Amino acid sequence: MSIGTIFRVIKMLYSVLWYTASLVSFMFNAFWLCCTLASAGIPWATLLLVIVCIASKFFKLSSPNEKQLNSLLGGNVADDLSFWPIAHRGGAYDAPENSAAAIKKCTKRGFRNVLLDAGITACNEIVIVHKSTLQKAGLCGSISRVTMETLQNINISELHPLGSQFEPEKILTLGNLLRLLEGTNLTIFLLISDSSSKMIEKLKSTIKLHESFTRRVIVCSKSPVAIYQLRKVYPELICGLWCDKSPSRIILKTSTLLTSIYGAIFRNIIAPVIGISLVFISKDEFNLHISELWRNVGVRPIVYNVNSPNEKRYFQKVMKTQYLTDSLRSEPQLLVKT
């Protein structure tokens, strides 16, 4: 090996070592800068958190009492098998979703808890329908862009796999629903998909006109602001917060610390301020620890969507938690005739 070759090898090794040392130095300096900024920001973050906690005490709404909640949910008796399931959209696998037929079927089977979707039309009418129903009917866009006249032309029975077993069904208005509840012991979980000011004002006027609304309906929303606006006017109204899966939640999962902080803010600040009684959590994000954390702040968790008999038995016997289900035929302890 010639002297020139040896010199080039030594020069190459020197370059590699120099670049490696430079990279390590850069990473160390960047880490040191992050630590410095974090240490400087911690006092300010702590101060901000204290201010938010103090301010929340002045805006906090009182929660409805547990007795009122139990009367709506049918108590909290583990031996009462009808207590655990909440029929999602009236049991969308068993009957046309969000329909009068689905509600009547739940009543006939002895189940009293039903979750229905609600939106508001372009003509300012609250309707019991989900946007997926409109898509099946060939209508594009949100419910707020469709008129009531257009919706009345839809036969939702035709859109269901078992539609031939049912009479033609029209989309219900909220007024139709409240009249349908008369003479029944049903409790309706009304999941509002639209948290616009138009929807909130229409709901307020509906509650004002129907004294039984707060005794028969639990309003659920993904928006804490919408819940706060409703409960500020009607503090006796029982509300539930729907925790949806979103890209931001997926990002938070990458950091255990961020996830813990995010959950703590919702449980210890937002939930007490808006005075919710229920929270809806995906079964994939639920465990005994999460359940205890929510119950400790006076909020009852409900999981969604549970359709397997084995899963239902697990949530009944182990988790002691109510669940949304798309089918009442799969209740593990009951043989339900269709």
Task: Write out the residue ranges for each language-model feature.
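Phosphate-group recognition and catalysis centered on beta-loop-alpha active-site segments
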Residues: 2-338
